[in-house]
Swiss-Prot record:
Belongs to the citrate synthase family. Keywords: Transferase, Tricarboxylic acid cycle. The keyword Transferase applies. The active site is at residues 314, 372. It comes from Helicobacter pylori (strain J99 / ATCC 700824). Citrate synthase is found in nearly all cells capable of oxidative metabolism. This is Citrate synthase. The keyword Transferase applies. It comes from the Bacteria. The gene is gltA.
Length: 426
């Protein structure tokens, strides 16, 4: 099938082939548009442009659906652990049995330690440096420790590179946090599961499972591990978003893969991308009380006010974000099972959501709660500091970046990214 483009100036007709998709709309192959017509396509933000063909994740924005390699996100969250989802994204296959699942996880656990020299680098940062700045730098430094990943040839080479960074990113992130607060570094405990180990490195004390002495709480509960596991799964991949596209673009230059991942971390840092969950919680704090919600909703509608309600709306979803639905259910479940929530912020969030889902202003603009709206309150309940919300996103998304990178570098269509411009200067 083809599409005909007609130039109304000279009635010239040009035929362009379409590309079939297994899900979603077809695409028109405009790769030879300039060569054929002398025109570029102009698409700021690339909202109508597909830069690659992918088998990793698919979003149906109208129906509110998300798939990882053909599997519904709801099924993956309900039936599989995050490490199983990592295996799916990297290899295309879920584990066939518990032994395969454990084998993959044990490899991640054993690769979780980082070179001691990295500790000196983290200590050199100012105490107020944002953890995302430190994390991006730490991953970039990893490229100097594993220079062989610059030249990969076999599938085993690619998988080793990806599994190594997926294993080490939680350790690097935990070091960033503990370095910031001046707490002793907690080394990975390979006797713990991959996900429990993350909470342990963030909240633990050396030689003890004690978390917060003032609250008299000991250990990390299975319920907390399960909740955190689901959060990571929900953040594992999400199509060609800004950070994933950044990883692909940087990788297209032939750079070390960890440098491309570092660039993805920098892209995710932005408050319009991964930093949004941090902004949601800060905004709920700003609202302060349920009685103030109406006033802030009015500000959203005021054309003369630049105030934006964080945690609502999405570039792709024009209905309820399926990840947000899952997180809302998870938040309610944690509350019912006795996990301590910030009641004040939870009440404010519930009131904001109640109004937004009924108000025509939000409905007409497809402003539904997104994944960031609920993740912050859950992370706080898991005693994750607000400044560390975005690094948690990095932990979950690193495997998706690796999958995107591998798909790009192994594609026969791979070439260095070089967009055009419409020059309007002198």
């Amino acid at each position: 099938m083809s599409v005909t483009l007609i130039n109304n100036e000279n009635n010239a007709r040009y035929e362009f082939e379409t590309i079939e998709c297994t899900r979603g709309p077809k695409a028109v192959d405009f790769s030879k548009l300039f060569e054929t017509t002398g025109f570029f396509s102009y698409d700021p933000g690339y909202s109508s442009t597909a830069g690659c063909q992918s088998k990793i994740s698919y979003i149906n924005g109208k129906k509110g659906e998300l798939y990882y390699r053909g599997h519904r996100i709801e099924d993956l969250v309900a039936k599989y652990k995050y490490v199983d989802v990592c295996r799916l994204l990297l290899t295309g296959e879920l584990p066939k049995n518990q032994d395969e699942s454990l084998e993959f996880e044990l490899e991640l656990r054993h690769r979780s330690f980082v070179h001691e020299s990295l500790l000196n680098m983290f200590s050199a940062f100012p105490s107020n440096a944002h953890p995302m700045a430190k994390l991006s730098s730490g991953v970039s430094i990893l490229s100097t420790l594993y220079s062989t990943h610059q030249n990969m040839h076999t599938e085993e080479d690619y998988q080793t590179m990806a599994r190594r960074i997926v294993a080490k990113i939680p350790t690097l992130a935990a070091i960033c946090y503990r370095n910031e607060v001046g707490a002793p570094i907690i080394y990975p405990d390979i006797a713990r599961s991959y996900v429990e180990n993350i909470l342990f490195m963030l909240r633990g004390y050396p030689y003890s499972r004690l978390k917060h002495t003032t609250q008299g709480e000991v250990g990390i509960t299975p319920l907390e591990v399960e909740a955190f596991d689901k959060i990571l799964t929900l953040h594992a991949d999400h199509g060609q978003n800004a950070s994933s596209t950044t990883v692909r673009n940087v990788a297209s230059t032939g750079v070390h893969p960890y440098a491309a991942i570092s660039a993805g971390i920098s892209a995710l840092w932005g408050h319009l991308h991964g930093g949004a969950n941090e902004k949601v919680l800060l905004q709920l704090e700003e609202i302060g009380d349920v009685k103030n919600v109406d006033k802030y909703i009015a500000r959203v509608k005021d054309k003369n006010d630049n105030f934006k309600l964080m945690g609502f709306g999405h570039r792709v979803y024009k209905s309820y974000d399926p990840r947000a639905k899952i997180l809302k259910g998870l938040k309610d479940e944690l509350h019912q099972k006795g996990v301590k929530m910030d009641e004040r912020l939870s009440e404010i969030a519930a009131k904001v959501e109640e109004i937004a889902l009924k108000d025509e202003y939000f409905i007409e603009r497809n402003l539904y709660p997104n994944v960031d709206f609920y993740s912050g309150t859950i992370l706080r309940a898991l005693k994750i500091p607000v400044r560390f919300f975005t690094p948690v996103f990095v932990i979950g998304r690193t495997v998706g970046w690796c999958a995107q990178l591998l798909e790009h570098v192994k594609s026969p269509q791979a070439r260095i990214t070089r967009p055009r411009q419409v020059y309007v200067g002198d």
